[in-house]
């Protein structure tokens, strides 16, 4: 269904590879207008509008950019992911990755997009052209309890996405490095002799076991820990992504 929903307005390579207006491309504001479902591109030097266009319904207020500043990705609350070419002021592709979406994140290299969904309970990985690569049905490590995804963010130095789960006391880290080491699945008797089950490290989750639920979080400066809290818990926690558990 995700693949069938994909709309290509402008194929890759069909638009000019240079900006079509005069402005500092790295000094622009993207203004998401919540009331009337439009987006305005604002010149950061002159504080004047450059372009305004209609958006999908109820965009999330945090659009995500590719490293070169050319593309920006929007997520709507009803699951649509839109890719906008700032240089050409065009929506180039769209796909519906969920029914009730929390937010989206773009990888540090601009090649992947992760989408956090409340409905269905899923974490969707897309390529930069919005083709689905991996759809994770989100369940606990025992495969029993499903969960909504509260948020997903990019940990650029780790080459990974990190997601908080609403209904399971886990945080997931998903590497977008094709050379990521394999992930042990279950009990491992001997890592050296590979006695146990392993899954590919690329685009699969490593689970951190938590003391409480996470609704939202932020990274420490070295990106080795996340700090966050649940809305109902009344206290925060620190999760070490290498130790893969709560440490405080």
Residue ranges and their predicted role:
Residues 1-248:
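Predominantly soluble domains enriched in secretory-pathway, periplasmic, or organellar proteins
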